[in-house]
Swiss-Prot record:
Organism: Homo sapiens
Residue window of motif Switch 2: 64-81
Motif (Switch 1): 32-46
Consequence recorded when altering T23N: Probable dominant negative mutant locked in the inactive GDP-bound form; alters the basolateral recycling pathway in epithelial cells and endoplasmic reticulum membrane morphology
Name used for this protein in its record: Ras-related protein Rab-10
Biological classification of the source: Eukaryota, Metazoa, Chordata, Craniata, Vertebrata
């Protein structure tokens, strides 16, 4: 059996309208790269990045979902095992911000009750084209008791900070397991979070 190279596995999900920059946010964090020619995600895709927090190696499995309505049933099935969900809107697109309330409802309907949520106002490098004031993002985050960052995948603003903050928030409420605990086997099951036996 291959030696496990991490202590914990956190499944994260990026959701939001098509075109808000979810894939760019993910690639900036996972590969420190930015590409202006991404095509829309078809269905679902994921990346893995291992980070170290509080002396623990944490493998982040980050799922990038399609924002289009026609993929709705595919993507909602991925909400269940998610431990952290980033809701992304585009500060230059008012409709993408209005739809955040719809995405929040999707989380309530499909995700685990204790999932950590975070709101990201992306493309903050395009301030000259801004239509969503920062205060509006802060307000909706306050109303729902979630963290908020304005980010830019292009200019690499707050991307790493957002992911690490979300991971820290999850870590804070993750029960500490004894190192010799025998009931944990993450090596099987293709990387899904089978070890978190909260839901049935």
């Amino acid at each position: 059996m291959a030696k496990k190279t991490y202590d914990l596995l956190f499944k994260l999900l990026l959701i939001g309208d098509s075109g808000v920059g979810k894939t760019c946010v993910l690639f900036r964090f996972s590969d420190d790269a930015f590409n202006t020619t991404f095509i829309s995600t078809i269905g679902i895709d994921f990346k893995i990045k291992t980070v170290e927090l509080q002396g623990k190696k944490i493998k982040l499995q980050i799922w990038d979902t399609a924002g289009q309505e026609r993929f709705h049933t595919i993507t909602t099935s991925y909400y269940r095992g998610a431990m952290g969900i980033m809701l992304v809107y585009d500060i230059t697109n008012g409709k993408s911000f209005e739809n955040i309330s719809k995405w929040l409802r999707n989380i309530d309907e499909h995700a685990n009750e204790d999932v950590e949520r975070m709101l990201l106002g992306n493309k903050c490098d395009m301030d000259d084209k801004r239509v969503v004031p920062k205060g509006k993002g802060e307000q909706i985050a306050r109303e729902h008791g979630i963290r908020f960052f304005e980010t830019s995948a292009k200019a690499n603003i707050n991307i790493e900070k957002a992911f690490l903050t979300l991971a820290e928030d999850i870590l804070r409420k993750t029960p500490v397991k004894e190192p010799n605990s025998e009931n944990v086997d993450i090596s099987s099951g293709g990387g899904v979070t089978g070890w978190k036996s909260k839901c049935c």
